[in-house]
């Protein structure tokens, strides 16, 4: 079903690392990170919820959430959160501790900020701490157009196996913070480049704004924004676009092994321009019609690989060499058939 990856291969390296501290908000590029069972440090450890229902809110339905910008400040040990003003066009920055509330509250298990009914994707209710000053809560609520709260994930273990309808690898029981399905998402720069190269032709053929999607316009923006796809680890040096579809196990650096579990079926979040918070109808579906490649994902296009660390802790940095230890063979007609494709 899989084989040791022995073909001649250029050296693959970690090109970029990204964390998204607040679910559905803007990401931050970093040079290195420790990781735990829930993924890179501070990745999706906070989320914004409706103040009444405690249901999580997402840029899938509120695209402008991507303009809320949390930044990890190691010097002050704070998460600095810049919130745009819905009326003035300006923005204000507020801070919450990076430290988990359980480490600084006098009685964390009985603190009034702790609640147990926060809802993420129909899972069993999750525990979490309501955090942030009244000023931050007010700014977020005004921007979101409803009463909201900022929540830090509690200590209760959230397993992938608890997420309804999500596949999980036999023998692996990944846990995660407030991410949707898995603690890590891996993508390759080669695949992004190939996708970017398609856009001008597809835009012209399908009647989209050719000026907006011309090669020069895309280049002036630094290329298609990888943040649309919200990966944590972007690798360079992969020989063929979407070769990562066939990966099963990789090693990053000397001994940090990562299980590459499943293709990531994309919702409409990649259609949101991270610079403007406005949805683009061209992406992802119009450009990626040939990326309906996972039988278990139905008609959804796929980009990136849902993954999980094998170790409970470790570290990753930009420039780390990535070694593919196990991979599925490429089929004669192109593409890869993974275990989940064979059994479903």
What spans do the regions from the language model cover?
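Metal-cofactor-dependent catalytic cores
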Residues: 1-344
């Amino acid at each position: 079903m899989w084989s040791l990856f022995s073909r001649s291969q250029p050296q693959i390296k970690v090109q970029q690392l990204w964390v998204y501290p607040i679910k559905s908000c803007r990401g931050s590029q970093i040079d290195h990170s420790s990781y735990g069972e829930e993924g890179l440090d501070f990745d999706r450890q906070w989320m914004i919820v409706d103040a009444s229902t405690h249901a999580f809110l997402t840029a899938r339905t509120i695209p402008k959430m991507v303009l809320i910008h949390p930044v990890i400040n190691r010097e002050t040990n704070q998460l600095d959160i810049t919130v745009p003003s819905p009326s003035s066009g300006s923005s204000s920055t507020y801070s919450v501790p990076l430290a988990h509330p359980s480490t600084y509250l006098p009685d964390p298990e009985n603190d009034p900020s702790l609640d147990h009914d926060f809802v993420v994707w129909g899972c069993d209710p999750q525990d979490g701490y309501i955090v942030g000053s009244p000023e931050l809560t007010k700014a977020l609520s005004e921007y979101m157009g409803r009463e909201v709260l900022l929540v830090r994930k509690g200590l209760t273990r959230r397993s992938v196996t608890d997420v309804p309808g999500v596949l999980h690898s036999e023998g692996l029981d990944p846990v995660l913070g407030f991410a949707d399905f898995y603690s890590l998402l891996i993508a390759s720069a080669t695949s992004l480049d190939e996708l970017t190269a398609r856009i001008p032709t597809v835009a012209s053929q399908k009647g989209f704004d050719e000026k907006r999607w011309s090669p020069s316009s895309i280049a002036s923006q630094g290329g298609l924004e990888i943040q649309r796809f919200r990966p944590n680890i972007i690798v360079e040096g992969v020989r063929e676009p979407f070769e990562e579809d066939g990966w099963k196990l990789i090693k990053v650096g000397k001994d940090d092994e990562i299980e590459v579990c499943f293709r990531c079926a994309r919702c409409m979040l990649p259609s949101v321009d991270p610079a403007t918070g406005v949805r683009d109808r061209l992406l992802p579906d119009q450009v990626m019609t040939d990326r309906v490649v996972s039988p278990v994902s139905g008609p959804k296009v796929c980009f990136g690989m849902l993954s999980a660390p094998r170790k409970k802790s470790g570290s990753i940095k930009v420039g780390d060499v990535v070694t593919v230890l196990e991979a599925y063979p490429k089929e004669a007609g192109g593409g890869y058939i993974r275990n989940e494709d064979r059994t479903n």
